[in-house]
């Protein structure tokens, strides 16, 4: 079943990417995209940013105004600042509650679309072979392991295929990360060396 074979491989790649990047990072990016959409939450986010700018501006004006020489003006700014701060905190709490609900929804959806789907496929297709091995190619003991737990003898079960995919994806991913780190390291060393040489030349000129 090629479609099931590819689906399991694709799911393992997605799970590895999420675990490598970090679920919190993925959730943060999705939140930034969500508040750009024309929704009620995006309206709350825009109002929160506007109120924050207003609070900062009023605080700056208060700092620039003398409470002794211009007390009337300073007191008026203080009242406006306190009122704006109260409105900002209320709006910020509303946005925080919306984000908490969004984070919980995303966590459930992410689990259902990755690990949850993988568990469902392993249960539903536990008797379905991913592919069939050539007759007599390997000993029956190994065939039994590869067909574990419920696939026909002489085939590879979805559980074994999923474990193999997870292992290979992790090995390939780690190898790619190590290669990128090795390639980028000489560039960083050259930048540091160039900065050191420029510093020494500057000292000699002085």
Swiss-Prot record:
Residues 1-4, 132-155 are lumenal. GO terms for biological process: tail-anchored membrane protein insertion into ER membrane. One of its GO terms (cellular component) is GET complex. The keyword Transport applies. Residues 75-100 form a coiled coil. It is found in: Endoplasmic reticulum membrane. The chain crosses the membrane at residues 5-24, 111-131, 156-172. It is a multi-pass membrane protein. InterPro entries: Get1, Get1_fungi, Helix_hairpin_bin_sf. GO terms for molecular function: protein-membrane adaptor activity. Residues 25-110, 173-206 are cytoplasmic. Keywords: Coiled coil, Endoplasmic reticulum, Membrane, Transmembrane, Transmembrane helix, Transport. The keyword Coiled coil applies. Its main location: endoplasmic reticulum. Belongs to the WRB/GET1 family. Interacts with GET3. Required for the post-translational delivery of tail-anchored (TA) proteins to the endoplasmic reticulum. Acts as a membrane receptor for soluble GET3, which recognizes and selectively binds the transmembrane domain of TA proteins in the cytosol. This is Protein GET1.
């Amino acid at each position: 079943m090629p479609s099931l074979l590819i689906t399991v491989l694709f799911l393992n790649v997605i799970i590895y990417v999420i675990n490598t990047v970090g679920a919190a990072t993925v959730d943060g990016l999705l939140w930034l995209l969500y508040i750009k959409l024309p929704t009620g939450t995006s309206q709350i986010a825009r109002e929160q940013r506007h109120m924050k700018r207003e609070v900062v501006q009023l605080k700056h004006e208060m700092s620039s105004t003398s409470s002794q020489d211009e007390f009337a003006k300073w007191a008026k700014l203080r009242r406006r600042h306190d009122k704006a701060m109260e409105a900002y905190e209320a709006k910020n709490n509303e946005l925080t509650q919306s984000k908490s609900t969004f984070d919980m929804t995303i966590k459930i959806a992410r689990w259902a679309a990755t690990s949850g789907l993988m568990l469902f496929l392993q249960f539903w297709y536990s008797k379905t072979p991913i592919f069939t091995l050539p007759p007599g190619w390997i000993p029956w003991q190994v065939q039994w392991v590869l067909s574990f737990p419920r696939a026909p003898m002489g085939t590879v079960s979805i559980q074994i295929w999923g474990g193999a995919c997870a292992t290979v994806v992790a090995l390939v991913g780690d190898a790619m990360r190590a290669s990128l780190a090795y390639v980028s390291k000489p560039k960083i060393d050259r930048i540091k060396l160039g900065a050191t040489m420029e510093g020494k030349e500057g000292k000699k000129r002085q």
